[in-house]
């Protein structure tokens, strides 16, 4: 129970219940990350305490954003090792979650995690966001889209906003210096039907990490031409 108090404190900070079951799920998840990271590249963060603080607690902080607490469905785009989708699912069992990633090896890992943690109402998709966002069963179908991926905000917005239904939210988990990104992305967010509603500064206790949650509300439907074809988005971000 070495890390129980650390995780419980983080949950208390965002008004979430925490118990032994959730703790054991987090520890099993940590162990799977460490085991699989020897086979495939999941994360450069591999020590116990660093995984707890720099991955898990960072993801828990997304609950500071009120839309997450009310959401019934969520898609995590470019989820990688399952961040933030798996921690969200552990803490909010009633939400339906889709994890999307372009690398099959990571999807294989995530399916193992889902089975080992006995998570329900969660699915994995292998492929590109640009393709799935044009499919009727995914386009404008989710209350929330989230991403912790490293792409700039203009690019992330075109990947993510098309998945969100009108009235829903895209939440981008960004680093400490986000002002220039926001300035550069404001026009693209507007084109895609979004509007920046809030920017929340996040501190991760006992670390030097300072992050921002960029909360974007979907105020209009996304035009049919977006997202554009694979490859174009990164080469030529909307301006």
Swiss-Prot record:
The keyword Transferase applies. Its EC number is 2.1.1.-. Keywords: Cytoplasm, Methyltransferase, rRNA processing, S-adenosyl-L-methionine, Transferase. It comes from the Bacteria. It is an enzyme of class 2 (transferase). InterPro entries: rRNA_ssu_MeTfrase_G, SAM-dependent_MTases_sf. One of its GO terms (cellular component) is cytosol. It is found in: Cytoplasm. Pfam families: GidB. The keyword Membrane does not apply. Transmembrane segments: none annotated. S-adenosyl-L-methionine binds at residues 78, 83, 129-130, 148. GO terms for molecular function: rRNA (guanine-N7-)-methyltransferase activity. Specifically methylates the N7 position of a guanine in 16S rRNA. HAMAP family: 16SrRNA_methyltr_G. Belongs to the methyltransferase superfamily. RNA methyltransferase RsmG family. This is Ribosomal RNA small subunit methyltransferase G. It comes from Clostridium botulinum (strain 657 / Type Ba4). The lineage of its organism: Bacteria, Bacillati, Bacillota, Clostridia, Eubacteriales. The gene is rsmG.
């Amino acid at each position: 129970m070495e890390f129980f108090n650390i995780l419980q404190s983080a949950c208390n900070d965002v008004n979430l219940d925490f118990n032994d079951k959730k703790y054991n799920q987090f520890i099993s998840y940590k162990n799977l990350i460490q085991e699989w990271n020897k086979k495939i590249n999941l994360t450069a963060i591999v020590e116990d305490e660093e995984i707890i603080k720099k991955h898990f607690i960072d993801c828990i902080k997304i609950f500071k954003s009120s839309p997450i607490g009310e959401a019934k469905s969520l898609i995590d785009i470019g989820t990688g090792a399952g961040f933030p989708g798996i921690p969200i699912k552990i803490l909010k069992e009633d939400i339906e979650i889709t994890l999307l990633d372009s690398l099959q090896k990571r999807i294989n890992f995530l399916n193992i995690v889902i089975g080992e943690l006995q998570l329900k109402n969660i699915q994995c998709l292998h492929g590109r966001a640009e393709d799935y966002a044009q499919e009727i069963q995914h386009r404008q179908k989710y209350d929330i889209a989230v991403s912790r991926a490293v792409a700039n905000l203009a690019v992330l917005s075109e990947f993510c906003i098309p998945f969100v239904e009108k009235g829903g939210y895209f939440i981008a988990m960004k680093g400490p210096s986000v002002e220039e990104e926001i300035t550069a992305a404001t026009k693209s967010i507007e084109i895609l039907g979004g509007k920046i509603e809030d920017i929340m500064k996040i501190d991760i206790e006992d670390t030097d990490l300072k992050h921002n949650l960029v909360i974007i509300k979907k105020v209009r439907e996304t035009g049919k031409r977006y997202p554009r074809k694979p490859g174009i988005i990164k080469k030529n971000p909307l301006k």
